[in-house]
């Protein structure tokens, strides 16, 4: 089994400190595991956590405010619920959400992920969404994208974004980390693209990011993993 496969199937720090594994993995192999774990657990607010992990997220932009909790029975998928206050349609509702990891590729210095995401309103099953979310990152560089096709009883729409960024410095695991990003997003309800700078900070299990544009105003995201 390769290091990549090993990490993908065992994203658990307890594996690293287990003595039997320690004596069977060469020093460079241990370094690779730490590096991939650092990328996997730290840089990006992932829609799937480690096996048995939970994540609480809050989002706010010009379209909606939402609070989203998800639980990951395995590293391959997560299930959750999202409470939404939609500013555009002036309505409150919830989604039952399911996210599945379609593909993950680990190298010595990077990780690539591709996810399927979906949600359904249990009170109005005709209101739902499907989409894709992906990212590629190293400790220095990040790129990501997202796309949603939303079915709504009032009006259907799509929401999409791309994001690129870099870390101005490389901290150690557990340090405060900073990312400087550029994000461009488009919502078919509003038309046109909105591009703006984003700052992201994370330390341990806590992450916050925010950006601002005159057209879309504040775009904020807070996450805590436990």
Protein language model features and the residues they cover:
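Membrane-helix boundary connector in multi-pass membrane proteins
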Residues: 188-192
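Transmembrane beta-barrel domains of bacterial outer-membrane proteins
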Residues: 46-182, 194, 198-226
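Cleavable N-terminal export/targeting peptides
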Residues: 1-48
